[in-house]
Amino acid sequence: MNNAPIGIFDSGVGGLTVARVIMEQLPNESVIYIGDTANSPYGPKPIAQVRELSLAIGEELVRRGCKMIVIACNTATSAALRDLRERFDVPVLGVILPAVRRAVSTTRNGKIGVIGTEGTIKSGAYQELFAASPSVEVHAQACPSFVSFVERGITSGRQILGVAQGYVEPLQAAGVDTLVLGCTHYPLLTGVIQLAMGDRVTLVSSAEETAKDVFKTLSMTDMLASEDSTPVRTFESTGDPVLFAQLAERFLGPHVTNVEKFAGM
């Protein structure tokens, strides 16, 4: 047993979609969540900069005694997963592979779409993993403005629906029946994206599959928290903690009672 916290980070509030499921499925686990809103969005940034930011946050999480790091950000996963695993002695999990597994098992016609930030799509991380399933045809589309909409609290309305329809038009033309939400911000746009794609397309998020990987890894290494432990959940932002708390309510509701200013970078 190990009652040390799980460290989770993202470029902003999007990773809370992953944190929420982890906390629901592993109710005894303590969590330290860091949202790097001061540097959001990660998508347009050079890979080297995203890697540097990710390593800095990872250093701080390890310094605080986290037993595991979850990169709850697709862009950071594609840019820095390997580097964090090489740098730190704790397990480090990303969110891309879980989404790929889920999509492959979900598709009916073998045509899968992936939407994400510019950084994630350009990295080819999803395409590389899908290549292990030769019967699958992958169509990737960058949606660069989605993260900024979410970070401003805009998750519905004609403006964002129009933007979404423009983004997904090539995916509709390709006949995809399964769409991977390749950014942890995107689940908050599920209604808009589903409306733009149509009811016949299944949307896939990595949150639940990532939580399963967390449980499996902690179980195999005997690092699950004890059943009588009282979890402590800490949420921090590199930007404005008040704004972060307001946006976080959309993801976690009453789970977020206090957001602190992160000063580790």
UniProtKB/Swiss-Prot annotation:
It is an enzyme of class 5 (isomerase). InterPro entries: Asp/Glu/hydantoin_racemase, Asp/Glu_race, Asp/Glu_racemase_AS_1, Asp/Glu_racemase_AS_2, Glu_race. Substrate binds at residues 10-11, 42-43, 74-75, 184-185. HAMAP family: Glu_racemase. Keywords: Cell shape, Cell wall biogenesis/degradation, Isomerase, Peptidoglycan synthesis. Belongs to the aspartate/glutamate racemases family. This is Glutamate racemase.
